[in-house]
Amino acid sequence: MKIILAGTPEFSIKTFETIINHFDVIAIICQPDRKVGRKQILTSPPVAQLAKKYNIPLYQPQKILEILPVLEKLDFDLFITMAYGQIIPEVILNLAKKLSLNLHGSLLPQYRGAAPVQRAIWDGQTKTGMTLMKMAKTLDSGQIIFQAPVAIDESDTTDDLLNKLSDLSANQIVDWLDAIKNNQYQMIDQDLSKVTYAAKILPVDEKIEFDTVQKTMRKIHALSSNPGAYWIDPTRNKRIKIFRVSKTFVANAIELNCTDGKLYATSFQIEGKNKVSLK
C-alpha cells in the first residue's frame, strides 16, 4: 500500500517510523518550521526531521490546501494523520483510493477534540487508549475501525501517558494496517450518547487553585508537559511552575497545602531559575 503521513510532534514519531519500515510511504506532511526557545532558533518539527532521515518527500504548508495540486497528482491508498495540527478538508480526505485515517489518543467517542490526554488525566480516568478511525468532515466523528486500551496510573503526567500511547500505537499499527490491506476490518459508528469533549487547555486553566490532594495532583500532572500549572508563592512573590508532585514526603520538595492534605512538588521551576527535578 502507498501511504501519505501527516503529523508534527514527537508523539507521532514511533508510529510513523514503524509505518515507514513496513509500508511504502510516498510523502510526509507536517507543520512549518517554528522559532523556539529563548534564542528563537528556527527548528524543524520532529516529523520533518524523520522525513529527512528517510529521504521521503516532505511538505510543510501553512495551510494544507496549499498543496492540494501536489496531492492530486499522487497515487496513494491511505492518508494517515496523527497529531498533525490542522483540520483536513474533505477534498483532501477524498483523494485516498482506500481510506483517510486518523490515530487519536483516546477511546472514542470519549474525549473528542484538542486535549484528550490532558483531559483524561485531569478527570481522573483510569483507562484511555488509541483509536484508529476513518476521518470525517466533523472533527473526531468518524467511524471507529480499531481501538486498543492502556491504563492511566495515578502518578502519570501527560508526558508519561503520551509515551504509553505512542508505544501502544507503534505496537498495533502494522497489524491494523495489514488488516485494512486485506479487507479484514469493520467500521463502527460512534455512539453519540457517549460522546465527550476534550477542550483545548487555556491560560485560565493554568493557575493552581488548591483543592483536594487528588484533584490538585491530577490538574498538575495533566498540565505538566505544556503549558505547566503554576501558583504564586507568597513568601517569594514569584510564579512557580509545578510539573510533578508526590503524595509522600520528598526531601527538598516544595510543600503544597491542599484542602485535605499535602503534596510535595518534585519537579518545579521558580520564576527566573532553572527547572529542578528531584529523584
PLM feature spans:
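N-terminal beta-loop-helix "entrance" segment that forms/cooperates
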Residues: 34-52
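Hydrophobic beta-strand scaffold residues
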Residues: 25, 58, 99-100, 128, ...
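A residue-level signal for conserved active-site and pocket-lining positions in enzyme catalytic cores
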Residues: 7, 28, 51, 79, ...
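Donor/substrate-binding cores of folate-linked one-carbon enzymes
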Residues: 20-21, 78-195
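Short amphipathic alpha-helix with an adjacent loop that forms part of the alpha/beta core around
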Residues: 65-75
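N-terminal Rossmann-like dinucleotide-binding module
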Residues: 1-38
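An anion-binding loop in the catalytic cleft
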Residues: 209-279
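Acyl-group handling in specialized metabolite and lipid biosynthesis
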Residues: 199-211
